[in-house]
């Protein structure tokens, strides 16, 4: 004689077809990173400073692009990353006088009328 009735012995749960469907979906899902190193990577930088050391000077004609990263939770200092025409990226000292001149030239160059 059983203490539980035959109805109480059955535990309700997901059907076998639902379990099979979930297993199939898990097998078909490709493992990999959720976010790739695309444009979102620039926004979602690692939470650390980009520049571990800075270069004091570089000729302004060698610079093709400047990126300025403000103080934030990732780093307690302003960082300036210069992309050079040869493809390299270097960190520049944001307090360097030459960099202030380069930034001023860039700002003045955009306001010139031809």
Swiss-Prot record:
Q: Does the keyword Signal apply?
A: yes
Does the entry feature the keyword Disulfide bond, yes or no?
A: yes
Name this protein carries in UniProt: C-X-C motif chemokine 5
Q: Location of site Cleavage?
A: 44-45
Free-text description of this protein's post-translational modifications in UniProt: N-terminal processed forms ENA-78(8-78) and ENA-78(9-78) are produced by proteolytic cleavage after secretion from peripheral blood monocytes.
Q: How does it assemble?
A: Monomer. Homodimer.
Q: Transmembrane segments in this chain: where?
A: none
Intrachain disulfide bonds: 49-75, 51-91
InterPro entries for this protein? Chemokine_b/g/d (IPR039809), Chemokine_CXC (IPR001089), Chemokine_CXC_CS (IPR018048), Chemokine_IL8-like_dom (IPR001811), CXC_Chemokine_domain (IPR033899), Interleukin_8-like_sf (IPR036048)
| Organism listed in the record | Homo sapiens (Human)
Which gene does this sequence derive from?
CXCL5
* Source taxon at top rank: Eukaryota
A molecular function (GO) held by this record is: identical protein binding
């Amino acid at each position: 004689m059983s203490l539980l009735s035959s109805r109480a012995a059955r535990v309700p749960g997901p059907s076998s077809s639902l379990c099979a469907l979930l297993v199939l979906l898990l097998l078909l899902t490709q493992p990999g990173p959720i976010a790739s190193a695309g444009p979102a990577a620039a926004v979602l930088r690692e939470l650390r400073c980009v520049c571990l050391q800075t270069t004091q000077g570089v000729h302004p004609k060698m610079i093709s692009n400047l990126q300025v990263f403000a103080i934030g939770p990732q780093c307690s200092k302003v960082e300036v990353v210069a992309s050079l025409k040869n493809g390299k990226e270097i960190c520049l000292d944001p307090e360097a006088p030459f960099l202030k001149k380069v930034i001023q030239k860039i700002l003045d160059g955009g306001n010139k009328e031809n």
